[in-house]
Swiss-Prot record:
Protein family: Belongs to the ABC transporter superfamily. UvrA family.
Protein name as annotated: UvrABC system protein A
BP terms from Gene Ontology: nucleotide-excision repair; SOS response
Binding-site list for ATP: 32-39, 644-651
UniProt xrefs under CDD domains: ABC_UvrA_I (cd03270), ABC_UvrA_II (cd03271)
Coiled coil: none
Keywords: ATP-binding, Cytoplasm, DNA damage, DNA excision, DNA repair, DNA-binding, Excision nuclease, Metal-binding, Nucleotide-binding, Repeat, SOS response, Zinc, Zinc-finger
GO cellular component annotations of the record: cytoplasm; excinuclease repair complex
Domain of life of the source: Bacteria
Major subcellular site: cytoplasm
Native source organism of the sequence: Zymomonas mobilis subsp. mobilis (strain ATCC 31821 / ZM4 / CP4)
Cited Pfam families: ABC_tran, UvrA_DNA-bind, UvrA_inter
Zn finger residue spans: C4-type: 743-769
Length: 946
């Protein structure tokens, strides 16, 4: 077998005909400037080809269910294994996906509760035992005389298949009727059922009317049904709603309450299967409701000023709604100018929930006409509820949904499962009790479980427990011990979700695989980094090739082999500058990475720390998530860094509490903040901006030029050119989103999508405009010999130079270059930008606005995806914002950023329930001397003179 992955002539994106041999079964780190071609080589070439070859080897039927990768632009690659990529982007937003389901821990837990759990009656608290036929007969005979019922044998429950053969056998045995998926049929008239879908089939054993002397026949029919369905029978009312259906089981039933569990199988504990999901919330554990805090986000506003957000969306507010409110004000005698919070509770309730049948004269005017209608007032919330149910429009449904929050389901109280599943206990815990635990307590629960089980139970549980304990151990090892097992995947950060998938990959125990990882150290404190690196080494030692795109210094130093890409970014990158051991990189004079590793270049500690403008922003009594009544002060006019181990409460304090509270007050945002007692100092600010890593646009039509507003200036500039004016072209002519100037063959996309079925969709360059997006006439308008299509194809650096004489465009381009994005194309599709790049495009947009010196900027891990040199440039930009009088709060683990901050707030001491306290606050020097601060421990050596 080949000992290397041999790549020849890789030209994907900006790669310059790269040829390299990468050792197999080693830990290989790819590093280099942001945009230098690391991901193009690791993901778009090596992973894409490995995955493509594997999928291509499958049958055409299997291929249609798998995403096919495009063939990368490379001459040839040898020595590839099946490839698995673990990226940050693929966090599932599915509300049914949890930490336990993603890691497969929940699958093993379901098996454990099904095989070892003991059902207890909710009524008596005693274990449930088998039911006798006599007890079943007594329960049916207790129905009112004359009740008509069907006695059913559930022979198929939630299984796929056609069941033709079985139907013939049932008919042969003397049965004439079936119920298939809730509908009754004669067996000979039963429809052909779809073998690819799950079905419920019950045989009708008997049809009865309750009367005296029926006991013998009923007992015989019950015995037949139980025998046919493996110990289960159903009594179903023939007249709908006359009585509740009864489920009988020879196995588990409470003699007092009649509470019955049909079967204890793993699917009973699945909240994604109808057999296990709570019927009230369909297994989601929560139900949406209209939240008054979202409907009236700012209680200081009056009704006239738009306190009711759903009715104040338009400017000016809709006259129809204002006339309704005026009628209510006349009838109930209150003023529309009174702030919402000062209105009596009765008035607030009438406005929100309606007049409860009380008829109110509602006066409307249309032009010169005035008319009055007397009717009960529906109420804002009732109006939204009705519209949500009756509308067919997805956009209206989405718009109304913005006023909803989720509350725990009233039936299962957030447990997601039906009562039968929650009645099954192991060591006095149902399955939901354990999923509510965080990783560490859950690990402890399963480790001590064998002592609580009988010898027979231990024989069954041994292998299941081994799998659960191993997987929980991996989560603990990659620094995720603070996560609860029922935590929704959608609430995890990119770094957390990547490390969870990493833990499940190690759990799978595969070998001979190529793993490609994208910055697994994101969001990880230096303390946990060593454990992550041990995990990567373990993955390698299983016999896998581990390829990691990473900027972390420890990871680079620990690697078996390092590939340094460069020398610049974008068109200036795409070459391998150095490849070899970490020492080889350090010794290479051309390697920027080597220069930082060796100390030839460094991010310097500032000579002095800013003291700020003397004002401060203080939040008191914050208790969101795991925060323990935290009070924090941020000096304004400074660069503040919030630090702490993963899960210590940084995001809860800054994003969930401080930002949401400030955004509601300063920006009028419709957000719900975490609980806190008070916030002071907002009067010193005029706005708060959260620059996060969410995409700048979700369609290929969105790009850096459209997002920053530069595209409007570019279109206006082209419209002013003599040729454009001679032809009568306005700025709209130069848009690729509307008819007129765009190429109609591809509708301004530049490419056409061809669906290939069993193969990946192919995007072919439009044969009319050849990818330019515009029609020929529009492209004939040129500035310095370049059309607008040529401008969109330029890099930001080239465009800044090209429009040197046009300040409105040049300044926006220069700002993008300043945040280190000089290499991206002006018209690059937003969907192709990484999270870090999207964040910096947002930063550039904010920087290009006129500075007020009273803005609070909040950034969450802005160094994601950044090389040492990129971090240095970013710090220059952030410090320039602070020098203008603004305040910056950054959540960060990167010690190069932390050491340059003016003020630190360190949370901890641990993650999850062990965190949520401020361990230290002050200058980096002060925090470095604080006992018990993990950040201080690592910071100390960074502050020592080299």
């Amino acid at each position: 077998m080949l000992s290397t992955i041999s790549i020849r002539g890789a030209r994907e994106h900006n790669l310059k005909n790269v040829s390299i041999d990468i050792p197999r079964n080693k830990l290989v780190v790819m590093t280099g400037l942001s945009g230098s071609g690391k991901s193009s080589l690791a993901f778009d070439t090596i992973y894409a080809e490995g995955q493509r070859r594997y999928v291509e080897s499958l049958s055409a039927y299997a291929r249609q269910f798998l995403e096919m990768m495009q063939k990368p632009d490379v001459d040839h690659i040898e020595g590839l294994s099946p490839a698995i990529s673990i990226e940050q982007k693929t966090t599932s937003k599915n509300p049914r996906s949890t930490v336990a389901t993603v890691t497969e821990i929940y699958d093993y837990m379901r098996l454990l509760w099904a095989r070892v759990g003991i059902p207890y009656s909710p009524a008596t608290g005693l274990p449930i035992t088998a039911q006798t036929v006599s007890q079943m007969v007594d329960r049916v005979m207790a129905l009112p005389e004359g009740s008509r019922l069907h006695l059913l044998a559930p022979v198929v429950r939630g299984r796929k298949g056609e069941y033709r053969k079985e139907m013939a056998e049932w008919q042969k045995a003397g049965f004439s009727r079936l119920r298939i998926d809730g509908e009754y049929y004669l067996i000979e008239e039963a429809p052909k059922i779809d073998k690819k879908r799950k079905h419920d089939i019950e045989v009708v054993v008997d049809r009865l009317v309750i009367k005296e002397g029926l006991e013998t026949r009923l007992a015989q029919s019950l015995e037949t049904a139980l025998k046919l369905a493996g110990g289960i029978a159903i009594s179903e009312p023939a007249d709908e709603g006359s009585f509740e259906p009864m489920l009988f089981s020879e196995h588990f039933s409470c003699p007092v309450s009649g509470f019955t569990i049909p079967e204890i199988e793993p699917r009973l504990f699945s909240f994604n299967a109808p057999q296990g999901a709570c019927p009230a919330c369909d297994g989601l554990g929560e139900k949406p409701y209209f939240d008054v805090r979202l409907i009236v986000p700012n209680e200081s506003l009056s009704l006239a000023k738009g306190a009711l957000m759903p009715w104040a969306r338009s400017t000016p507010p809709s006259p129809y709604y204002m006339q309704i409110l005026s009628s209510l004000a006349r009838y109930y005698d209150f003023s529309l100018e009174t702030p919402w919070k000062k209105l009596p509770e009765k008035i607030q309730n009438v406005i929100l929930y309606g007049s409860e049948g009380e008829v109110i004269p509602l006066r409307f005017s249309e032009g010169n006409q005035i008319y009055e209608v007397e009717k009960a007032f529906e109420g804002v919330i009732r109006n939204l509820e009705r519209r949500l149910v009756t509308t067919d429009s997805e956009s209206i449904r989405e718009d109304i949904g913005r006023y909803q929050s989720a509350a725990p389901c009233e039936v299962c109280h957030g447990a997601r499962l039906r009562p039968e599943a929650l009645a099954v206990l192991i060591d006095h815990h149902n399955i939901s009790d354990v999923t509510k635990m965080t990783v560490k307590p859950a690990l402890e629960f399963f480790r001590q479980l064998p002592e609580k089980l009988t010898e027979a139970q231990n024989q069954i549980a041994e292998r299941i427990l081994k799998e659960i304990i191993e997987r929980l151990g991996f989560l603990d090892n990659v620094g995720l011990d603070y996560l609860s097992l029922d935590r929704s995947s959608g609430t995890l950060s990119g770094g957390e979700s990547q490390r969870i998938r990493l833990a499940s990959q190690i759990g799978s125990g595969l070998s001979g695989v190529l793993y490609v990882l994208d910055e697994p150290s994101i969001g990880l404190h230096q303390r946990d980094n060593d454990r992550l690196l041990e995990t990567l080494k373990r993955l390698r030692d299983l016999g896998n090739s581990v390829l990691v795109v990473e900027h972390d210094e420890d990871a680079i130093r620990l690697a078996d082999y390092v590939v340094d890409m460069g020398p610049g970014a974008g068109v200036m990158g795409g070459k391998v500058i150095a490849a070899g051991s970490p020492q080889d990189i350090i010794d290479c004079p051309d390697s920027l990475t080597g220069a930082y590793l060796s100390g030839r270049r460094e991010i310097a500690v500032p000579d002095k720390r800013r003291k700020g403008n003397g004002k401060k922003l203080t939040i008191k009594g914050a208790t969101a998530n795991n925060l323990q009544n935290v009070t924090a002060s941020i000096p304004l006019g400074t660069f503040t860094c919030v630090t702490g181990v993963s899960g210590s409460g940084k995001s809860s304090l800054i994003l969930d509490t401080l930002y949401t509270a400030a955004a509601r007050e300063l920006n009028g945002a419709r957000l719900i903040s975490g609980d806190y007692k008070s916030i002071s100092g907002l009067e010193h600010l005029d706005k708060v901006i959260d620059i996060d890593q969410s995409p700048i646009g979700r369609t290929p039509r969105s790009n850096p030029a459209t997002y920053t507003g530069a595209f409007t200036a570019i279109r206006e500039w082209f419209a002013k050119l003599p040729e454009a004016q001679a032809r009568g072209y306005k700025a709209g002519r130069f848009s690729f989103n509307v008819k007129g100037g765009r190429c109609e063959a591809c509708q301004g996309d530049g490419v056409k999508k061809i669906e290939m079925h069993f193969l990946p969709d192919v995007y072919v360059t439009c044969d009319v405009c050849h990818g330019a997006r515009y029609n020929r006439e529009t492209q004939e308008v040129k500035f310095k010999g370049q059309s607008i299509a040529d401008v969109l194809n330029m890099t930001v650096d080239q465009a800044a130079e090209f429009f040197e004489a046009v300040p409105s465009i040049r300044d926006k381009m220069a700002m993008l270059a300043r945040v280190g994005l000089g290499y991206i194309k002006v018209g690059q599709q937003a969907t192709t930008l990484s999270g870090g790049e999207a964040q910096r495009v947002k930063l550039a947009k904010e920087l290009s606005k006129r500075a007020t010196g009273r803005t609070l900027y909040i950034l969450d891990e802005p160094t994601t995806g950044l090389h040492f040199e990129d971090v240095r440039k970013l710090l220059e930009v952030l410090n320039a914002l602070v020098d203008q009088g603004n305040s910056i709060v950054v959540i960060e683990h990167n010690l190069d950023v932390i050491k340059t901050a003016d003020w630190l707030i360190d949370l901890g001491p641990e993650g999850g329930t062990g965190g949520g306290q401020i361990i230290a606050a002050g200058t980096p020097e002060k925090v470095a001397e604080t006992e018990g601060s993990y950040t201080g421990h690592y910071l100390k050596r960074m502050l020592q003179p080299k």
